[in-house]
Amino acid sequence: MVTKVKCPTCKTELEWGPQSPFRPFCSKRCQLIDLGEWADEEKRIPGPINPDLLPYPDEGEQWQ
């Protein structure tokens, strides 16, 4: 049985398997669009912010 999924970027249906090297995306273009959205912080993993992981402000700056 062939599993079909929709590309998360353009919603094109594709077969999940070795013939789809960019899965879950349909193409390199859709893969790069998604990567760009993460890099531009348009996407993020929801959850509480851990203050220990935040950088300290430079001297004289205020926390936002």
UniProtKB/Swiss-Prot annotation:
The record describes the protein's role as: Inhibits all the catalytic activities of DNA gyrase by preventing its interaction with DNA. Acts by binding directly to the C-terminal domain of GyrB, which probably disrupts DNA binding by the gyrase.
Q: What is the lineage of its organism?
A: Bacteria, Pseudomonadati, Pseudomonadota, Gammaproteobacteria, Aeromonadales
GO aspect biological process, one term: regulation of DNA-templated transcription
Sequence segments annotated as region (Disordered)? 43-64
Claim: Plastid is one of the keywords in the record? no
Which residues participate in Zn(2+) binding?
7, 10, 26, 30
Q: How does it assemble?
A: Interacts with GyrB.
Q: Which cofactor does it need?
A: Zn(2+)
Q: Which domain of life is it from?
A: Bacteria
Q: Does the keyword Magnesium apply?
A: no
Q: Which InterPro entries match?
A: DNA_gyrase_inhibitor_YacG (IPR005584), Znf_NHR/GATA (IPR013088)
PANTHER family, alphabetically? Answer: DNA GYRASE INHIBITOR YACG (PTHR36150:SF1)
| Entry protein name | DNA gyrase inhibitor YacG
The cofactor note reads: Binds 1 zinc ion.
Q: Which UniProt keywords apply?
A: Metal-binding, Zinc
Tell me its family. Answer: Belongs to the DNA gyrase inhibitor YacG family.
